[in-house]
């Protein structure tokens, strides 16, 4: 039996080849926003977004509007948005009493003819113990990371 004690565990991890030229780096929030909207508009099979939350502000509305526009153009498009459940239940800290983003998600869903479901994922029992803070996005066979 071979002793793998001094070998890197990464040598045996599942993997697939990735050419360096297939990786692009975006510099700045505006470049990320434009690429995100471009990928949403161009997706043909699937869009999976994970984020801490989508805020009821200009940026959040722009993303959700783009998702619904893509779904309207391609009704078979599989769209799923995953956000932290606890974070969606409250508004911005210091902004006074707010219903939270979950209320906005529900209202938006009820007023749209298209479906782009937003799932709240309760990672912990309370927000202070940890949140869903993944920043990965899948568009067909393209992966986009943020942060």
What is each PLM-predicted segment?
Residues 53:
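Gly/serine-rich nucleotide phosphate-binding loop at the start of the catalytic core
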Residues 5-42, 57-147:
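HKD-type phospholipase D/PLD-like phosphodiesterase module
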């Amino acid at each position: 039996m071979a002793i793998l004690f001094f070998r890197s565990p990464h040598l045996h991890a599942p993997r697939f080849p990735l050419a360096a030229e297939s990786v692009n780096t975006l510099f700045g929030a505006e470049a990320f926003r434009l690429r995100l909207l471009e990928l949403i508009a161009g997706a043909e099979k699937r869009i999976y977004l994970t984020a801490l939350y989508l805020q009821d502000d200009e940026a959040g509305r722009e993303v959700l509007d783009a998702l619904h526009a893509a779904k309207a153009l391609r009704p078979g498009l599989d769209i799923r948005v995953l956000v932290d459940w606890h974070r969606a239940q409250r508004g911005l800290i210091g902004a006074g009493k707010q219903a939270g983003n979950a209320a906005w998600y529900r209202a938006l869903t009820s007023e749209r003819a298209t479906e782009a479901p937003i799932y709240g994922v309760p990672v912990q029992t309370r927000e202070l113990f940890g949140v869903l803070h993944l920043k990965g996005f899948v568009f067909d066979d393209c992966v986009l990371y943020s942060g």
